[in-house]
Amino acid sequence: YGAIYASSINLSLFEISLYMMIITSAGALSQWPIGYLSDRIDRRVILIGVSFMASGLSLFFVFANFMPLTLFLIFTGLFSVACLPMYSLTVAHTNDFLQPNEIVSASATFGILIGIGSIIGPLFVSTFMEILGAVGFYIYLFLIHGLLGLFGLYRMTQRTKPRDLESQYNPLPRNISPAGMEMNPVT
């Protein structure tokens, strides 16, 4: 829906390409510094931080029509830095609580959840965009990331992080298959 949003705010074909390139490259490059931090700081803190960062940055896009293109693309990159590493952070955090023989099953569950989200998400986003216009895309993302951050704060009060089971962060694409996880020598 990023390209649909960009087209809806009247970006040219080249500008839409820049927008999509920045989303992908900034998100990919942010995996390493965010992963490095999450190996040294409680992953929940990092997850909550990037959730609220993504939520807050989403609000800037409500005013995208009034921004110069350069500023719009900078905010796009910052949003992507906060948003794209969330899947890998969540997998690493989950693995902190699992035994090695449980990792493949958990990864399969993540695959199913991503699939469900990929089906349901566009229905909600399109509804927001239909009702609110192009800004509905980022208003939806503002709400989703804000709720994730609040859920993370709530969960921090429910259990502590087990230091002895902590796993290393690995940047993972969202579409990794359970078969790929079976190649993990730990399992």
Where in this protein do the model-derived segments appear?
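Intrinsic disorder in cytosolic terminal tails and internal cytosolic loops
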Residues: R155-T187
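Intracellular juxtamembrane helix-capping segments at the cytosolic ends
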Residues: L84-Q99
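Helix-to-loop junctions at the C-terminal end of transmembrane segments
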Residues: S30-D42, M129-E130
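Loop-to-transmembrane helix entry/capping segments in MFS-fold secondary transporters
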Residues: L13-F14, L98-F110
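Short amphipathic helix-loop junctions that connect adjacent transmembrane helices
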Residues: Y1-E15
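Residue-level signature of mid-helix packing/kink "hotspots" within the transmembrane helices
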Residues: T24-W32, S118-I119
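Structural signature of the two symmetry-related core transmembrane helices
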Residues: V45-F60, F142
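A membrane-interface helix-boundary motif in multi-pass transporters
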Residues: T127-H145
